[in-house]
Amino acid sequence: MGFALVLIFLFGFYLFLMKSSSIFPQRPFTFLYDLWVLLLVLRFLFSLIQILILCLFNFRFVEMTSNNKKKKTELCDLPKCLAPHILSWLPTKTAVTVSLLFMKGWWRSEMKNLSSLKFSFSDDQEEEHFVRFVDQVLRQRGNRKLDSFSLTLNDEIDGGFVTHLVDYPLDNGVEKLKLSIYDIKGNFQLSSRVFSQATLVTLKLATNRSLIWINGDDVAAAHLPCLKTLWLDDVLVADVKVFVRLLSRCPILEELVMIDMKWHNWEACFVVSASLRRLKIVWTDYVEMDEYDRCPQSVLFDTPNVLYLEYTDHIAGQYPLLKFSSLIEAKIRLEMIDEKEEEDEGQEVIVGDNATAFITGITSVRKLYLYANTIQVLHHYFDPPIPEFVYLTHLTIQSDKELGWDAIPELLSKCPHLETLVLEGLFHLATDVCGDVCPCRRNMEQAISYLVKSPVTHLEIYEGVVGKKRGEVTEDAARFGEQVRWFLMRMLHLQQVKIYGQTEDSVTALYDIATELRRLEGKASPNVQISVLQA
């Protein structure tokens, strides 16, 4: 149609020229004939170009289709035994999508044999769709053996549905159960069947606002003969009797993790287990610890086979028993509590007297991490001398610019076999009782040479921020260099010093400090190696 219109236009234009001029007086149609031939040639060339483009496009399409088929074929040609294993590592929703879109035939049927289910509900999902999806997956899977089940709820969902959903893994012999319930609506009570599931190897319960609680009825018939890992995150346990009974029903428990356990109001806090290998009791937020105006009344650890301990708490009123005879590594953060004579209601506030018993109970440790608060506790709440850490070879000390190093001199003197000393920060509150471990002392002539006697061969130092621009030397950088120089001039057995910077800029500034330290004359250990790395 377009070609015809162009032809008519050109013919009309030609007639107009014929009438208005004498360009072609003798052969009036010669020009039109030549134009017609030219247009035919152009038409032919245009068609040829179209054919070439179509051929090229079809070739690429066939090639892409072939590659896609090849990829799908490669995926589908994997051994059948790998299908459920691969899908089990994915969240259930993703596994279903992969199965439907990319897998054919028997691959889809393998969805029924998934050994692991992972469901997660958040505020960007509709409750009705989530419930329908879960029901369809469970209906398709049926009542087959289940290895692992994980449920995470970050938004409100019907409690009755959750109760019904938790029953599914319990009915199918689940071995690893993880329930993270951070929001819910309606009535929800964790089934007591969870604590009598004989097949459970790992049990992790996480919540907030005490949405999950454990009372005496829950553990009355508790029986967890295969449980090796128990994780309680902000779970409310009624009292110490419930907790002790629960642990007693886990005869081969190896790992116990308690996060934000609100046990300050218990009559006592007992952790009794002969099978435990790893024990972690921590608070996730420093502020949360400050919300409590009382310390635990009595804390008891009867855990003779624990190898790793991570413990955060206020100083207890007493420590009647601490069995850590097999301890290898520990991270300790003990907090002091402000002393008060009475509460608003006239009740006495229990305040921990000292940490002597606790520190004495962990002297068999070989690798020890002490938070800055613990250093304060050792100084203010430790009446007799610090006990000797005969087996300690690796010590890490966290520093705080608002807390002193008062306890460090005596602590170093009680580590006769210490090889590696790690200091997380050097800046601390200057006092008169730091001994010779820092140059900020007031009475330097009275200092006892704790550093000179130290057997430490490896010193690792982490700093905060030392200069924001390349080569910039700030007041903190100068103090940092002065403190490191202090160590080098007094520690006789040093073989290696590693300095870690937090940023590229601070590493650059530290390189300049290290260069000066290498040229330093009179070092206590002349052959010490100094290196700077980025943390």
Swiss-Prot record:
Domain F-box positions: 73-119
Compartment annotation: Membrane
Chief location: membrane
Record-linked InterPro entries: FBD, FBL60-like, LRR_dom_sf, LRR_FXL15/At3g58940/PEG3-like
Keyword Cell inner membrane tagged: no
Transmembrane segments: 3-23, 37-57, 82-102
Alphabetized UniProt keyword annotations: Membrane, Transmembrane, Transmembrane helix, Ubl conjugation pathway
Presence of the UniProt keyword Transmembrane helix in the record: yes
GO biological process per UniProt: protein ubiquitination
Signal peptide: none
Highest taxon listed in the record's lineage: Eukaryota
Topology within the bilayer: Multi-pass membrane protein
Role played: Component of SCF(ASK-cullin-F-box) E3 ubiquitin ligase complexes, which may mediate the ubiquitination and subsequent proteasomal degradation of target proteins.
Oligomer status and interactors: Part of a SCF (ASK-cullin-F-box) protein ligase complex. Interacts with ASK4.
PANTHER family the UniProt entry points to: RNI-LIKE SUPERFAMILY PROTEIN
Protein name, as recorded: F-box protein At1g56610
Organism: Arabidopsis thaliana (Mouse-ear cress)
Lineage: Eukaryota, Viridiplantae, Streptophyta, Embryophyta, Tracheophyta
